[in-house]
Swiss-Prot record:
Keywords: ATP-binding, Cell inner membrane, Cell membrane, Membrane, Nucleotide-binding, Sugar transport, Translocase, Transport
Annotated protein name in UniProt: sn-glycerol-3-phosphate import ATP-binding protein UgpC
Subunit and partners: The complex is composed of two ATP-binding proteins (UgpC), two transmembrane proteins (UgpA and UgpE) and a solute-binding protein (UgpB).
Enzyme Commission code: 7.6.2.10
Length: 369
């Protein structure tokens, strides 16, 4: 095992096309880091640079106490698990797992010990004589992970390993990956576009957008204190509501605290207000109020800070979601499954000041009080 350091890591292709912009991160020995972001954000490129499959055009990558920029993949003491399994179809499960060790000239007894140990961890022992075509998708992915485990690397690299699995199997494999990391404790870097994988697997996560880091933090930190409107909109399902707001003409409300007014779609003030601004918060001319759907609560009309015009209600079993508008702006409210809310209703809502997030509408950056 080893720590992993990314120091001003950059990638530029021919024609001065820059896809990774100076990424810095210190990954502790044994930490499980998830890089998450939309397609084309540079996450797989960054992983491939760590693996040695892409050249680095700026900065340094350290694995342990070595700078590995110019080392071949085989010299970096890493093991990689790919999206497409990459198993040899003519080989048995045992031989697929053992092949890399044989190439390295390891003793037969040591190979057998490592393969059987990994097979025991992954519950593959009864399948060692089978060919890949005789396995399910989840079993094939476990073989791919077993092939990485037997190498006993300093760092595991995972490139969207669950993307080819169906929804039910992805849940099962997430749990198995979490348990695997708990048992092995190997430093791991995991790439995904799936926020659920990121939230459930990560010790810390890096949110990438356009080759730049939007935020690094624990899943709870990223969810509860998003650093930008991009993070607020990307992490969470449904995502955070982002409502354009302004001071209510500079007028003070109760206790001398300014009120917020929702801005309509054309940028003009609507008739909707949203309670009072937190003390000490200074809004720029253009600001966005962020509210998670679960933090908007239906209430009695006299307690409401706003009223939502409900257009659609989706029932999902334990929860329901009301989709509607507030002052002409789209908004989503999470409801109890037993809530009697219908399309066409006007739903009075409230929210705790602790759950209000504010962002600069121009830069998208979080505004702190």
């Amino acid at each position: 095992m080893a720590k992993l350091s990314l120091r001003n890591v950059q990638k530029t292709y021919a024609g001065n096309v820059k896809v990774v912009h100076g990424i810095d991160m210190e990954i502790a020995d044994g930490e499980f880091i998830v890089i998450v972001g939309p397609s084309g954000c540079g996450k797989s490129t960054l992983l491939r640079m760590v693996a040695g499959l892409e050249t680095i055009t700026g900065g340094d990558i350290h694995i342990g106490d070595r700078v590995v920029n110019n080392l071949e993949p085989a010299e970096r003491d890493i093991a990689m698990v790919f999206q497409n399994y990459a198993l040899y179809p003519h080989m048995s499960v045992y031989d697929n797992m053992a092949y890399g060790l044989k190439i390295r000239g390891m003793a037969k007894a040591e190979i057998e010990q490592r393969v059987k140990h990994a097979a025991g961890i992954l519950e593959l022992a009864p399948l060692l004589d089978r060919k890949p075509r005789q396995l399910s998708g989840g079993q094939r992915q476990r073989v791919a992970m077993g092939r990485a485990i037997v190498r006993e690397p300093s760092v595991f690299l995972f490139d969207e390993p669950l993307s080819n699995l169906d929804a039910k199997l992805r849940v099962q494999m997430r749990l198995e990956l979490k348990e695997l990391h708990r048992r092995l404790g190997t430093t791991s870097l995991y790439v995904t576009h799936d926020q659920v994988e990121a939230m459930t697997l990560a010790d810390r996560m890096m949110v990438l957008n356009g080759g730049r880091v939007e935020q690094i933090g624990t899943p709870l930190e990223v969810y509860t204190r998003p650093a930008s409107t991009f993070v607020a909109g990307f992490i969470g399902s449904p995502p955070m509501n982002l409502v354009p707001v302004a001071r209510n003409g500079g007028m003070a409300g109760a206790g001398g605290v300014a009120q917020m007014r929702v801005l309509g779609k054309e940028g003009g003030a609507s008739d909707a207000t949203l309670g009072h601004l937190p003390m000490g918060l200074h809004l720029p001319a253009e600001a966005l109020l962020g509210l998670r759907p679960e933090h908007i609560e239906p209430c009695a009309a006299h307690d409401a800070i706003a009223e939502v015009d409900v257009r659609v209600v989706e029932a999902l079993g334990a929860d329901s979601f009301a989709y509607g508008s507030l002052g002409g702006q789209p908004i989503v409210v999470r409801l109890d499954s037993h809530a009697r809310v219908r399309a066409g209703d006007k739903l009075p809502v409230t929210s705790s000041p602790d759950h209000l997030h504010f962002f600069d509408a121009q830069s998208g950056k979080r505004i702190e009080a």
